[in-house]
């Protein structure tokens, strides 16, 4: 999504409001939506806050409830080498222990299990470890005067979740639609109501901090005048950071924050340190920074940003410009934050230290990846014309309008080159795992609706599988068996994606759906909008588990279930890439997501039912999960409440919606972020053996102050794209920072298995960068793998790392211009020649081939920023 490349903040709001009005008045959404951001933009990302007065900056206030870290001196002298002082936090927003489910819900009777629970972050330091929120803002609040955290995410988890007592309700999207693609008559009401509630909240926000404190001295004319001056011409805090010397692998210091009026201050960490470290800030502005192990081993530099605010002191105004805070929404465009806060970036330099743990588990899964539609096509490869994406990229209208930029026939031809590719992956790259996908439309080019599974209580029987076998294209079934055989012959473990976006055209006819659904008419083959698609997907998943269970143990059922809600249902030309069916119908996104979740859960159960053969000794017969694309959003301006709210809302929805649904059983069907009893579904919970994390970069957000698009209550701003010429920007115009990977890994690690305590295992199923010159990729690979190593060294259960991609391929609507591969490909040569990218291959293979299963110091010295 490249929205901010084309439109600025105000222009973006105008575009969004225009889309919203159009949708509401005839192209609308039936879902109720609500602005659930906090009472104040300043607090909206705060999991907790650290509050102090500048007059007591060196001592902890009496009666404080904080459990922040010890003083810098004691921390530096007592913490052991590489001790975890902060793991970056487990949440993307302001969840706390009080927000956790009160009891552990149970699994449905079919497979009784205790309910999985999400671990909330804590501010308590235990054995020198403290979690810091990894959302757009993170802080610790101990002042009784401080505002209560009431962000979008805080409210989503404020109600106790108890699936064991939740009534079993039918999982549907609430609406008055007569058919799935119809317009809902309540659209105008919900749209206008949502805008009004956003404006009302914005009006009340400045008063959320409470009344100002009265004069401290006996009341006289002079003290009254001084008090008036203090409240109307309040000074903004200033910062003068002081950094102490490094000790035991830790860097301590103080932000040196002073409030000219003696107001208590709150300290809020924005995201995580850029280059992969962790930081904690206490109530006095003392910070403790820990570098990732790789940086500690060779030295380097990192930076983090902290927002210092005096807003918790109560209502006050920072001079004439400060009055802008009383202008709803627009005030933060004129004077962001009203002068209450200042953002301070601290740069830390790390001296190298010997004896640092740089190891990986000996059985760690090192892999590369590609996907069927993106890579199979090319000279000599049989064409598959039966998928929605094939129809989409060949559609004359799309080609004429420039909505698509490539066809699979010009691809790298992995369909025919699979054996030599497997050899390169193992021998040249040092991999032991290969991730790839099966194309549903190749296995079943025609409908499987004739196979009725309703007579088995909704499950797939052996007779059903045999009937499906009769409908399958046996040549293609054998082809994938041959591919898996080749992978194993090259000592590569298959990691197989059951569905990587594409659908058979009998499930989804994109061009017909585009016309009918945009007009609100019934569309029969509407993909995940159709109510029968989850059942058809269930059959397909059961079939591939039955057919390939003896060759495959590790299954990724769905690839990135959330991103298509933007590219498919807010496909504004030149603003958002157009994916089939290319609608501007954001109101349909919830139907899409709910049906995906239904299909995933049914597939999960079927794959465990039909894959009972262990293909690799020591592994479970079926290790089943999903691949979650995760983008940590940060406020473009950390002191602007609009930006903070936009980042919070994005993080709570984009990174958490799907795991909340299939791990916790909370299916937020109207996407409003507010948990209600009818959204709790025990039958959906605990359907995961691992979570795939897919991370490419972070995302600064410019906020609107409202959610202007009906159906998208979580979209309160637009992302800021970077220039590809910047050293930390990809060719996809996305900022790249290793700290963002830590952020999303901590989110993923906060989810628990059915026992409520064991972390859901993580598999990094995609990580990569579009880099045509291969100049940024080597450093990107090394630094992101270094974050993975650091997380493992400090206790996180991560099973593997997969680089995307093995070879340059068709990047969906963007065509072939974005080059992610470790190899290029020349489709004009008969052998589809693979062109190696030496610097990147050298960097990654030096790690994967290391005989000690460790990060080589020589490679770290080349690529860690500022290495000595």
Language model: regions and residue ranges:
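N-terminal structural segment of carbohydrate-active enzymes
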Residues: 355-470
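Aromatic-lined substrate-binding rim segments of carbohydrate-active enzymes
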Residues: 418-503, 590, 596-608, 622
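Short coil/turn motif common to extracellular beta-sandwich-like domains
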Residues: 246-252
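Acidic, turn/loop-rich segments in luminal/extracellular domains of secretory-pathway
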Residues: 255-257, 271-350
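Composition-driven, intrinsically disordered low-complexity tracts enriched in small residues
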Residues: 1-236, 240, 250, 313-349, ...
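Active-site region of glycoside hydrolase catalytic domains
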Residues: 356-363, 367-391, 477-478, 485-775, ...
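Glycine-rich anion/phosphate-binding loops
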Residues: 408-420, 469-479, 529-542
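Extracellular acidic loop/turn motifs
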Residues: 258-266
């Amino acid at each position: 999504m490249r929205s901010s490349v084309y439109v600025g903040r105000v222009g973006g709001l105008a575009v969004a409001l225009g889309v919203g009005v159009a949708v509401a008045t005839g192209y609308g959404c039936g879902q109720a939506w609500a602005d659930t951001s906090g009472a104040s933009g300043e607090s909206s990302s705060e999991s907790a806050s650290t509050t102090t007065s500048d007059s007591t900056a060196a001592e902890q206030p009496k009666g404080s409830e904080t459990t922040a870290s010890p003083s810098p001196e004691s921390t530096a002298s007592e913490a052991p080498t590489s001790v975890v002082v902060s793991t970056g936090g487990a949440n993307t927003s302001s969840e706390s222990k009080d927000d956790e489910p009160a009891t552990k819900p149970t699994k449905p009777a079919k497979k009784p299990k205790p309910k999985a629970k999400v671990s909330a972050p804590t501010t308590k330091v235990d054995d020198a470890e403290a979690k810091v929120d990894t959302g757009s803002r993170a802080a610790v609040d101990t002042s009784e005067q401080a505002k209560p955290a009431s962000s979008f995410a805080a409210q989503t988890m404020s109600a106790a979740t108890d699936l064991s007592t939740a009534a079993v309700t039918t999982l549907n999207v609430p609406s008055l639609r007569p058919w799935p693609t119809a317009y809902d008559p309540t659209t105008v009401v919900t749209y206008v109501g949502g805008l009004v509630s956003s404006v009302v909240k914005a009006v009340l926000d400045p008063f959320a901090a409470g009344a100002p404190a009265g004069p401290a001295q006996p009341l006289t004319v002079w003290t009254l005048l001084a008090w008036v001056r203090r409240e109307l011409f309040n000074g903004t805090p200033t910062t003068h950071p002081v950094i102490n010397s490094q000790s035991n692998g830790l860097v301590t210091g103080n932000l040196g924050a002073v409030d000219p009026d003696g107001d208590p201050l709150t300290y809020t960490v924005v995201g995580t340190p850029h280059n992969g470290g962790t930081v904690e800030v206490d109530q006095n502005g003392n910070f403790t920074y820990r570098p990732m192990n790789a940086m500690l081993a060779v030295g380097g530099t990192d930076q983090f940003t902290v927002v210092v605010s005096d807003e918790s002191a109560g209502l006050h105004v920072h001079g004439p410009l400060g009055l802008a805070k009383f202008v709803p929404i627009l005030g933060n465009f004129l004077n962001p934050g009203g002068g209450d806060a200042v953002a301070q970036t601290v740069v830390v330099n790390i001296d190298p230290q010997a004896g640092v743990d740089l190891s990986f588990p000996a059985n760690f899964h090192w892999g590369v990846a590609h996907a069927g539609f993106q890579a199979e096509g090319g000279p000599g490869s049989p064409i598959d014309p039966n998928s929605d994406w094939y129809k989409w990229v060949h559609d004359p209208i799309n080609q004429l309008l420039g909505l698509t930029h490539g066809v699979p026939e010009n691809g790298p031809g992995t369909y025919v080159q699979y054996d030599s590719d497997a050899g390169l992956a193992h021998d040249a790259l040092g991999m032991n795992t290969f991730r790839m996908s099966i194309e549903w439309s190749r296995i079943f080019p025609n409908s499987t609706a004739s196979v009725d599974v309703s007579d088995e209580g909704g499950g797939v029987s052996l007779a059903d599988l045999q009937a499906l076998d009769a409908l399958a294209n046996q040549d293609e079934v054998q082809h994938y068996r041959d591919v898996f055989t080749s992978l194993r012959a090259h000592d590569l473990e298959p990691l197989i994606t059951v569905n990587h976006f594409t659908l058979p055209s009998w499930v989804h006819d994109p061009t017909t759906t585009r016309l009918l659904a945009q007009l609100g008419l019934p569309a029969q083959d509407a993909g995940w909008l159709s109510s029968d698609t989850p059942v058809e997907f269930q059959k397909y998943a059961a079939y591939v588990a039955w057919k390939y269970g003896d060759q495959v143990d590790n299954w990724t059922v769905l690839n990135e279930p959330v991103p298509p809600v933007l590219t498919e249902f807010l496909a504004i030309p030149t603003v958002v890439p157009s994916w089939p069916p290319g609608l501007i119908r954001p109101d349909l996104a919830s139907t899409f997501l709910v049906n995906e979740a239904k299909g995933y859960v049914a597939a999960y159960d079927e794959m465990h039912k039909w894959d009972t053969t262990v293909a690799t000794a020591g592994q479970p017969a079926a290790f089943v999960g999903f691949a979650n694309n995760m983008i940590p959003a940060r406020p473009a301006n950390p002191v602007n409440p609009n930006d903070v709210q936009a980042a919070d809302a994005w993080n709570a929805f984009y990174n958490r919606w799907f795991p909340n649904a299939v791990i916790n059983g909370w299916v937020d069907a109207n996407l409003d972020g507010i948990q209600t009893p009818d959204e709790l579904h025990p039958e959906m919970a605990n359907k995961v053996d691992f979570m795939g994390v897919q991370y490419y970069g972070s995302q600064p957000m410019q906020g609107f102050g409202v959610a202007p698009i009906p159906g998208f209550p979580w979209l309160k701003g637009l992302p800021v794209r970077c220039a590809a010429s910047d050293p930390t920007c990809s060719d996809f115009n996305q900022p790249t920072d290793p700290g963002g990977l830590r952020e999303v890994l901590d989110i993923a690690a906060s989810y628990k298995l059915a026992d409520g305590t064991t972390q859901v295992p993580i598999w990094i199923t995609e990580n990569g960068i579009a880099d045509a010159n291969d100049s940024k990729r080597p450093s990107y690979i090394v630094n992101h793998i270094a974050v993975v190593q650091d997380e493992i060294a400090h206790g996180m259960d991560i099973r593997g790392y997969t680089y995307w991609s093995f070879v340059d391929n068709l990047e969906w609507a963007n065509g072939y211009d974005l080059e992610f591969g470790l190899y290029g490909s020349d489709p004009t040569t008969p052998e589809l020649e693979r062109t190696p990218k030496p610097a990147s291959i050298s960097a990654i293979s030096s790690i994967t081939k290391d005989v000690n299963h460790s990060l080589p110091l020589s490679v770290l010295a080349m690529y860690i920023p500022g290495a000595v």
